[in-house]
Regions:
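Carbohydrate-active catalytic/glycan-binding domains of CAZyme proteins
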Residues: 22-379
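Sec-dependent N-terminal signal peptides
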Residues: 6-10
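Positively charged n-region of N-terminal signal peptides that target proteins for export
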Residues: 1-4
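C-terminal motif of bacterial Sec signal peptides marking the signal peptidase cleavage site
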Residues: 14-17
Length: 379
């Protein structure tokens, strides 16, 4: 089980020089330039080309996107035997009080996996959970306040578990978005994103009775198996699960980034009928959807997925664009990326020991800013 911790961030204020002193006029790995120590016609390695052009001759600490992390234990939300607290939301400050929302289980036995799980015994640490919230005056000392959003009524799309929340502040109201599953919870269960809203950060919360985002076009599972990896076709990049929503307000619209799974996660391993299938999408990617209203409809972007790496979605406005922290999975993991349009992300910095599934305190996340200032701490 995870213990919630607070982290602080040092973001350097230097700007990338980004190839201002190097003019590339050959496609044959030859750079002509006026830099000391280099001569016209000198051939360079691919690494040196990147150093001069992409990284602008800077050391990591001179890069404005370079980030280091320090970690401190939270007070008030310490580890508790038999209880899972995880997946903190964006942190908000309302009337000098910080609020964070998170996945929490009741005190129960240890998870037993999908095959052995029952209506009262969890399959994993995010099973049989509700959305709780805690408050703080200083961001370090926290007090758990109770349930914000509980599981839905029996037979509903969210009757098994609600988890991985994020909070949106929009036009004087508050919206919680979260991953949801129904009973029975198996390897092949579809995951959706639900929503509840309130006029206060403390509730009461009004549950939206249908998901606001669902998986995309499905593939086909092998009927003779119950394994998620055993498929006949993949479907869309998010054909199996949409979850870990993370939101910003931009262009007066609600922008939702989310973690996505295709059907067939793990299908690179041998399976009854799936051997030889060409895998079109990574196991973990980041999707993007836009809505005019917090209740939707959320329209998925045609360039999805907007990141082929990462685990949870984590975004914030930065300068005139959108930044994202990519962790845990994929060829571009452990990087800070940025896109002026919020869609076509590029690696801007590599990072070490980033927080997984973090919740950020970012004051301008919902302000529709065109000059994002970043963030300095989170949970």
């Amino acid at each position: 089980m995870k213990q919630l911790i607070i982290f602080s961030i040092l973001i350097c204020s230097f700007c990338l020089s980004c190839n201002k002193n190097v003019e590339k006029i050959s496609t044959q790995n030859t750079l002509y330039n006026n830099l000391d120590g280099y001569y016209d016609g000198k051939k360079l390695s691919a690494s040196m080309e990147r150093y001069l052009e992409q990284w602008g001759q800077t050391e990591p600490s001179q890069n404005e996107f370079y980030t280091s992390f320090s970690y401190y234990p939270l007070k008030g939300l310490e580890y508790e035997e038999g209880v899972s607290r995880r997946d903190p939301s964006t942190i908000i400050n309302i009337k000098d009080t910080y609020y964070v929302y998170y996945t929490r289980s009741s005190k129960t036995v240890a998870p037993v996996g999908y095959k052995k799980a029952t209506k009262t015994v969890p399959a994993n640490t995010w099973d049989l959970c509700d959305i709780y919230y805690a408050t703080s005056k200083d961001g370090i000392n926290w007090e758990e306040q109770g349930v914000s959003v509980s599981r839905g009524p029996e037979g509903s799309f969210d009757d098994r578990s609600v988890f991985t929340p994020d909070i949106l502040c929009y036009k004087g109201k508050y919206y919680l978005y979260y991953q949801a599953v129904s009973y029975p919870y198996t390897e092949r269960s579809k995951n959706v994103i639900g929503m509840s809203w309130s006029e206060s950060p403390e509730g009461p919360w009004h549950r939206f009775d249908t998901p606001v985002l669902k998986p995309g076009k499905p593939g086909k599972f092998v009927e003779s198996s119950n394994k998620r990896a055993h498929i006949e076709s993949y479907g869309d990049f998010d054909s199996h699960k949409v979850h870990d929503p993370n939101l910003i307000v931009r262009n007066s619209e609600i922008w939702m980034y989310y973690k996505a799974h295709p059907m067939g996660v793990g299908s690179e391993h041998p399976m009854p009928k799936g051997v030889g299938l060409k895998k079109p999408y990574p196991n973990f990617s980041m999707g993007f959807a836009i809505a005019k209203d917090p209740k939707g409809p959320f329209v998925k972007h045609p360039l999805n997925p907007v990141s082929a790496s990462g685990h949870e979605a984590l975004v914030w406005p930065y300068n005139e664009g959108v930044a994202t922290m990519i962790t845990a999975n994929g060829p571009e993991k452990n990087t800070i990326q940025w896109a002026e349009d919020g869609i076509n992300f590029e690696v801007k910095s590599h990072i070490v020991l980033p927080p997984d599934a973090a919740g950020l305190f970012c004051e301008d996340k919902y302000t529709n800013t065109s000059n994002g200032q970043g963030f300095t701490w989170g949970i």
